[in-house]
Protein backbone atom coordinates (compact mmCIF):
# COMPACT_ATOMS: atom_id res chain seq x y z
CA UNK A 1 0.00 0.00 0.00
CA UNK A 2 0.83 3.64 0.35
CA UNK A 3 1.75 3.60 4.05
CA UNK A 4 5.43 4.06 3.29
CA UNK A 5 4.49 7.33 1.56
CA UNK A 6 3.09 8.85 4.76
CA UNK A 7 5.56 7.23 7.18
CA UNK A 8 8.28 9.87 6.85
CA UNK A 9 5.77 12.66 7.40
CA UNK A 10 4.57 10.83 10.52
CA UNK A 11 8.14 10.56 11.86
CA UNK A 12 9.11 14.19 11.27
CA UNK A 13 5.79 15.54 12.50
CA UNK A 14 5.98 13.35 15.60
CA UNK A 15 9.18 15.22 16.45
CA UNK A 16 7.44 18.53 15.83
CA UNK A 17 4.60 17.52 18.15
CA UNK A 18 7.10 16.75 20.92
CA UNK A 19 8.65 20.17 20.37
CA UNK A 20 5.28 21.99 20.32
CA UNK A 21 4.45 20.59 23.75
CA UNK A 22 7.82 21.62 25.18
CA UNK A 23 8.82 24.59 23.05
CA UNK A 24 11.33 27.34 23.55
CA UNK A 25 10.26 30.64 22.01
CA UNK A 26 13.82 31.52 20.98
CA UNK A 27 13.85 28.48 18.66
CA UNK A 28 10.61 29.23 16.79
CA UNK A 29 12.23 30.89 13.77
CA UNK A 30 14.88 28.16 13.56
CA UNK A 31 12.18 25.48 13.63
CA UNK A 32 10.30 27.24 10.82
CA UNK A 33 13.50 27.71 8.79
CA UNK A 34 14.43 24.04 9.16
CA UNK A 35 10.93 22.90 8.26
CA UNK A 36 10.81 25.06 5.13
CA UNK A 37 14.32 24.01 4.13
CA UNK A 38 13.50 20.31 4.55
CA UNK A 39 10.20 20.55 2.68
CA UNK A 40 11.73 22.44 -0.23
CA UNK A 41 14.81 20.23 -0.42
CA UNK A 42 12.71 17.08 -0.60
CA UNK A 43 11.17 18.27 -3.87
CA UNK A 44 14.34 17.28 -5.72
CA UNK A 45 13.49 13.59 -5.08
CA UNK A 46 10.38 13.72 -7.27
CA UNK A 47 11.51 11.10 -9.79
CA UNK A 48 13.54 8.82 -7.50
CA UNK A 49 11.31 5.90 -6.58
CA UNK A 50 13.39 4.61 -3.67
CA UNK A 51 12.93 7.88 -1.78
CA UNK A 52 9.33 8.62 -2.81
CA UNK A 53 8.21 8.64 0.86
CA UNK A 54 10.48 11.63 1.50
CA UNK A 55 9.14 13.47 -1.53
CA UNK A 56 5.57 12.79 -0.34
CA UNK A 57 6.56 14.04 3.12
CA UNK A 58 7.75 17.27 1.52
CA UNK A 59 4.49 17.69 -0.39
CA UNK A 60 2.48 17.41 2.83
CA UNK A 61 4.76 19.84 4.65
CA UNK A 62 4.49 22.38 1.83
CA UNK A 63 0.70 22.08 1.79
CA UNK A 64 0.58 22.77 5.53
CA UNK A 65 3.12 25.60 5.37
CA UNK A 66 1.12 27.34 2.64
CA UNK A 67 -2.20 26.67 4.41
CA UNK A 68 -0.95 28.27 7.63
CA UNK A 69 0.40 31.28 5.76
CA UNK A 70 3.90 30.39 6.98
CA UNK A 71 5.20 30.62 3.43
CA UNK A 72 4.15 32.39 0.28
CA UNK A 73 5.64 32.17 -3.15
CA UNK A 74 5.95 34.84 -5.82
CA UNK A 75 9.14 33.94 -7.70
CA UNK A 76 10.76 33.36 -4.30
CA UNK A 77 9.74 31.81 -1.00
CA UNK A 78 8.89 34.21 1.81
CA UNK A 79 8.61 32.97 5.39
CA UNK A 80 6.13 34.73 7.69
CA UNK A 81 7.37 34.07 11.20
CA UNK A 82 4.27 35.74 12.68
CA UNK A 83 2.24 32.73 11.44
CA UNK A 84 3.93 30.39 13.93
CA UNK A 85 0.79 29.82 16.04
CA UNK A 86 -1.31 29.16 12.93
CA UNK A 87 1.36 26.75 11.71
CA UNK A 88 1.33 24.93 15.02
CA UNK A 89 -2.45 24.58 14.82
CA UNK A 90 -2.37 23.25 11.27
CA UNK A 91 0.28 20.68 12.19
CA UNK A 92 -1.60 19.54 15.29
CA UNK A 93 -4.73 19.00 13.20
CA UNK A 94 -2.81 17.14 10.48
CA UNK A 95 -1.08 14.91 13.03
CA UNK A 96 -4.36 14.18 14.85
CA UNK A 97 -5.94 13.26 11.50
CA UNK A 98 -2.96 11.04 10.72
CA UNK A 99 -3.24 9.28 14.08
CA UNK A 100 -6.94 8.64 13.46
CA UNK A 101 -6.00 7.28 10.06
CA UNK A 102 -3.55 4.80 11.58
CA UNK A 103 -5.96 3.79 14.35
CA UNK A 104 -8.74 3.06 11.86
CA UNK A 105 -6.26 1.24 9.57
CA UNK A 106 -7.62 3.23 6.65
CA UNK A 107 -5.82 3.15 3.32
CA UNK A 108 -2.88 5.54 3.48
CA UNK A 109 -3.65 6.82 0.00
CA UNK A 110 -6.77 8.47 1.45
CA UNK A 111 -4.61 10.58 3.78
CA UNK A 112 -2.14 11.42 1.04
CA UNK A 113 -5.01 12.41 -1.28
CA UNK A 114 -5.80 15.30 1.06
CA UNK A 115 -2.55 16.89 -0.09
CA UNK A 116 -1.45 15.36 -3.38
CA UNK A 117 -2.75 13.59 -6.45
CA UNK A 118 -0.93 11.25 -8.79
CA UNK A 119 -0.68 12.49 -12.37
CA UNK A 120 1.25 10.62 -15.03
CA UNK A 121 2.90 8.54 -12.30
CA UNK A 122 4.04 11.56 -10.23
CA UNK A 123 2.51 12.92 -7.05
CA UNK A 124 1.72 16.62 -7.36
CA UNK A 125 0.17 19.06 -4.89
CA UNK A 126 -3.60 19.49 -5.01
CA UNK A 127 -3.41 23.14 -3.99
CA UNK A 128 -2.61 25.39 -6.96
CA UNK A 129 -0.32 27.74 -4.99
CA UNK A 130 1.71 24.80 -3.73
CA UNK A 131 1.77 23.26 -7.19
CA UNK A 132 3.02 26.48 -8.79
CA UNK A 133 5.92 26.53 -6.35
CA UNK A 134 6.72 22.81 -6.73
CA UNK A 135 6.67 22.98 -10.53
CA UNK A 136 8.89 26.08 -10.58
CA UNK A 137 11.33 24.61 -8.06
CA UNK A 138 11.56 21.29 -9.89
CA UNK A 139 12.13 22.98 -13.25
CA UNK A 140 14.97 25.02 -11.70
CA UNK A 141 16.38 21.90 -10.06
CA UNK A 142 16.34 20.05 -13.39
CA UNK A 143 18.05 23.01 -15.09
CA UNK A 144 20.78 23.74 -12.55
CA UNK A 145 20.52 21.40 -9.57
CA UNK A 146 23.06 18.87 -10.73
CA UNK A 147 25.64 21.20 -12.18
CA UNK A 148 29.04 21.30 -10.60
CA UNK A 149 31.62 24.04 -10.53
CA UNK A 150 35.33 23.41 -10.75
CA UNK A 151 37.32 25.45 -8.27
CA UNK A 152 39.76 26.49 -11.01
CA UNK A 153 36.85 28.12 -12.89
CA UNK A 154 36.01 30.47 -10.03
Residue ranges and their predicted role:
Residues 1-6, 27:
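Alpha-helix capping and helix-loop boundary segments enriched in small/acidic/polar residues
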Residues 16, 20-125:
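Long, well-structured alpha-helical subdomains associated
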Residues 4-20:
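An active-site-proximal "capping" alpha-helix that borders the catalytic cofactor pocket
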Residues 103-154:
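Extended, compositionally biased alpha-helical segments that mediate assembly or anchoring
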